[in-house]
Amino acid sequence: LKPGADFSYNRTTGSRSAANGYKEAPVIINGKLEPGSGGGVCQVSSTLFNAVLLAGLEVTQRTCHFSPVSYVPLGRDATVAEGVIDFCFRNHLKHGVYVYAEYAPGSISVWILGNKEDKPSYVDISKTKEETVPFKTVNRVDPSQKEEQKTEEGHEGKNVTVKQSVKWADGRVYHDLFESDYEAVDTVITYKNKEDLPKE
């Protein structure tokens, strides 16, 4: 990636179809796991996002998931969706860089390789804000369901800010902030009979 050039994750990885070699795996849709072609690509884009942060590159487009993910620290994920959501960054360094990624069973690694003059002398990636968004319990009635009572567990949301601070030996400095708003999901309890609803 030459100096001043932009990297697009979606453009680089191409259409996530079976014809292009992508397999079906779980994908997160509206906060729920569902099977889809290319499931798991967000783990690669999130790992790349963290490598970009540590290399001191400039992130130009990044979106968090609907809910926090387990494979990167809170606020340091980058979701992608073909034709809708991309992860992009720019090489604003003095020299070109290479993006090298490697897969091994159970792990993904991404390196940003380049000129030693562009290697930061100081990097700090830290949370500057973490707020909890509460969730509610919602009771409903559905006479058509088989179960007497069905519960869909919810979870709290999070509002997080992560700061990227980078310094180079020649005096250059770079800072950026990344906001992540993870939605709260209400617990929904559905009863077959209206008479079973809890009394308020």
Feature map (PLM): residue ranges:
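Well-ordered beta-sheet/strand-loop patches within structured domains
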Residues: 1-200
